[in-house]
Each structure stands twice: as structure tokens, then as C-alpha cells.
Amino acid sequence: KTYVDRDYPNYNFPVDLRTNVSGNGGVEPATFQNLLKFLEFQKTNNGMKVEKFDIGSNKQFALKKDPKSYPGFEIRNIKSNNLLWTGKGKNTTPLFTKEELLAKNGKFNDNQMSTALVVKYGKFKYYAGGDNSGLVDQDHAEWYDIETPMAPIVGKVSAMSLNHHSNRDATNRNFLDVLDPKVVVAQSWSTDHPGSEVGQRLL
């Protein structure tokens, strides 16, 4: 078994989560400490591996059973934290800085640090990108738009999971135009999901 995390083992972007107790955003300190204890227990007692999400890799998530029979299957890691794969090797480009993320009174949101990946099998291609956002308005700086620079790296897909539970601050027009999915999956958990604006963009 393997556990993959966006910021293992340092957990220091945008702040040191091991010592962060200010409640300025992200995961609750008590919950994070419990996660660390869980991971240590699993490593020690059950041999579980813990790895950092390897941006650009198409080897980290691989078939376990008879992979040679499915040469067209691939999972490609596209984005994690503030780093986006360039499409070449393991090269990445930063989408925003720690300072930009913490600009509002030192508070931050984990959403923009979400991982993103693409699953391919033959002609089928599927995108999933967690809570990555794509909105720019009077309340959100340009860096908040993760989707527009990520779109050409992902390219056209067969199907996709709508970013941020299909919330109105994600799945922007640029992203939809480039990915051009035939099927979308909305992982809704609130009465305002999907956002009406997202619904209009999907029409």
C-alpha cells in the first residue's frame, strides 16, 4: 500500500503544517497531527509507503495486475501545490507564490494546492483536479485562476471531474473550451453545487 501526499515529507508549503496552530487556514492542526500519527503507525506496523506527489510522472500510479497487457493505460501527474507540469520531462512552472497565497492577513485556502492528474486508456482520457479554481474577479487575483494555464497541459479529454465540486469559482470558460469533455462528473456535497454559472458554461 502507498499513501501519496502533495507536500510529504516537509509539509511546509505555504506554512509549516507541523507547527501551525494559528488556525489561519488549511487543515485543522489537531486533524493534521492525527494524520501524521496514522501515517507513522501504518509505516511501522503495516509497511505502508508514503510518497510525495511526483509532478510529471506517469509511473507513480501504475497498474498492479498484468500491466504489460494494457500498454495504452497511463496516469499522468499534472499539478500539485503551486507547481504545474510543463509537459516536458519533470519540468514544472510556478503558478503562484507563498506570499501571494498568504496575502490576505496570512490566511490561506488549501484548494489552490490541489493535485491534478489525467488518466488515459486507449482513446479514452479523463481529467480529475480536486478543488483547483479558475475565477478572476474583484475579490480574486489573477493567480487564483489555476485552470487557464493548466488547460493546454491537460488538452482535450473524453470526460472530466468538475473542479471544486462544480462550485462557481471553478470550471471556467477557457478550461471547458480546451478540454471539451463529452461527459462531466459533479461531486456535489452542498445545495449550491453545481453553481448556476457553471451550469450555464456547460450548456
Each model region followed by its residue ranges:
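Cap/insert and terminal regions of metallo-dependent hydrolase folds
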Residues: 2-22, 103, 108-112, 133-203
